[in-house]
Amino acid sequence: MSSAFLLLACALVISVHADGVCRNRRQCNKEVCGSSYDVAIVGAGPGGANSAYMLRESGLDIAVFEYSDRVGGRLFTYQLPNTPDVNLEIGGMRFIEGAMHRLWKVISELGLTPKVFKEGFGKEGRQRFYLRGQSLTKKQVKSGDVPYDLSPEEKANQGRLVEYYLEKLTGLQLNGGPLKREVALKLTVPDGRFLYDLTFDEALDLVASPEGKEFARDTHVFTSEVTLDASAISIFDDHLGEDYYGSEIYTLEEGMSSVPQGLLQTFLDAAKSNEFFPNNHLKALRRRTNGQYVLYFEPTTSKDGQTTINYLEPLKVVCAQRVILAMPVYALRQLDWSQLRNDRATQAYRAVRPMPASKVFMTFDQPWWLQNERKSWVTKSDALFSQMYDWQKSEASGDYILIASYADGLKAQYLRELKNQGEDIPGSDPGYNQVTVPLKDAILEHLTEAYGVERDSIPEPVTAASQFWTDYPFGCGWITWRAGYHFDDVISTMRRPSLKDEVYVVGSDYSWGLISSWIEGALETSENVINDYFL
């Protein structure tokens, strides 16, 4: 009996040490650090890069660690071989003048060049909708005949339907002004419940006809705010919130990736003690008795847009006095750190749901989408492609560039399955950004239907590339807030999950409302964490 017990004990000791991570305070206290820092920042997206930038002249020994070989996170400027003179944005692609103040400040400090994002969010006379099999102009969607049986009241408010529903639900009159966060979180519906406690369906079922609700859902296009358990407050913030109130829509001449790249480079140039280590995956985080943190990194390899963990290589052991986790919530939830499993943290991170997103770019030798009676530069639809944007013509090759699909939610997940089937098309980029025959065929079948042309009447793509924000470490293009959570009740926990630890979390996934879908959210969270805990 005793010998059997000893054998089991030995087996247990071997298993807990097999992955190279200390499992108790005594082991962690004995761990030998390969390098030590005052601050370790994990993640080189906008949140991590801005954290490093703000601390660049602090006099602290700081290191930034990145999972892949790329700086940028969900900002990803890309080029295709036949259109090298044109930046493709397969991540975040634009920003709003007058609404995103932190980004404007950073752009100015880095000396970057804003330029107008020509199509904005879709402009009158240049945008169409394809809904329930009908092609409609933007004007028709606002005030014309639509394939939805709207009530007389809904018809009278067709061009301001979301605001009309907010008025009926809460009695709030905006009178041309924005819906402010502090106001939105106090709004109640007639039965006394807070608006943020309701889902989109629960809220609109109180005031909308069934057809009116579907019209609002379909014209919103993005599914993040209008499906499953998304808080009803999300769609009202998206359409009416103060972060949406601005003027022109811009992008950057240098590409959107130039923001995190510029922030990180400025950090590195500021002091010799500032360091950057790409291709390091944070596996586990531990704390010693003296308060120092032990970070265990797995080496990774990046090739053709795909990063893989080198499981057979030894772990890198890094120690730090303080840690900033600039990680998407999808990756954060998978980190081996016990404090993320406490009830307080678990409840806080449950407030947000990662939303898969995707973009598929294609180039053509002619702009077939502008050569028929339904021509448009932007098309938004309930069909599989979801959104299409004319990008621009390459002066290098004369080819025309198209975002053939910009989707989220279940559509993005379905398209991802198609991407993983069949052969790559001729002209596809290699590796993770590939476009396969099933993916190309499905998108173009729905897109040509929306434009009212035969599939065999358009040319095949010259080149193509895709980006699916579905896999580790991102897991999503952005998050949506779930019904039942008050932002101010959980945000401090999201950004500091353990009050006894100097471990902080930054990134757009931990920001409020609309800006959680934008770089502004990453800049806001990193700015607040650095100002509150480091400066």
Curated annotation (Swiss-Prot):
Q: Is Membrane included in the keywords of this UniProt record?
A: no
Q: Any signal peptide, and if so, which residues?
A: 1-18
Q: Where in the cell is it found?
A: Secreted
Residues binding FAD are 46-47, 66-67, 74, 91-94, 513-518
Q: E.C. number, please?
A: 1.4.3.2
Q: Name one GO molecular function term.
A: L-amino-acid oxidase activity
Locate the coiled-coil region(s) and give their ranges. Answer: none
Enzymatic reactions? an L-alpha-amino acid + O2 + H2O = a 2-oxocarboxylate + H2O2 + NH4(+)
Q: What does UniProt note about where in the body, tissue by tissue, this protein is expressed?
A: Expressed exclusively in the ink gland. Within the ink gland, it is only detected in amber vesicles (at protein level).
Primary localization: secreted
Its post-translational modification remark reads: Not glycosylated.
Task: Tell me, in a sentence or two, what this protein's role is.
Answer: Catalyzes the oxidative deamination of positively charged L-amino acids L-Lys and L-Arg and, much less efficiently, of amino acids L-His and L-Tyr. Has antimicrobial activity. Inhibits growth of Gram-negative bacteria E.coli strain MC4100 (MIC=0.62 ug/ml), E.coli strain C921-b2, S.typhimurium strain AA 140 (MIC=0.62 ug/ml), P.aeruginosa strain PAO1 (MIC=0.31 ug/ml) and V.harveyi strain BB170 (MIC=0.25 ug/ml).
The record's comment on protein family reads:
Belongs to the flavin monoamine oxidase family.
Name of protein: L-amino-acid oxidase
Source organism of the structure: Aplysia californica
What lineage is on file?
A: Eukaryota, Metazoa, Spiralia, Lophotrochozoa, Mollusca
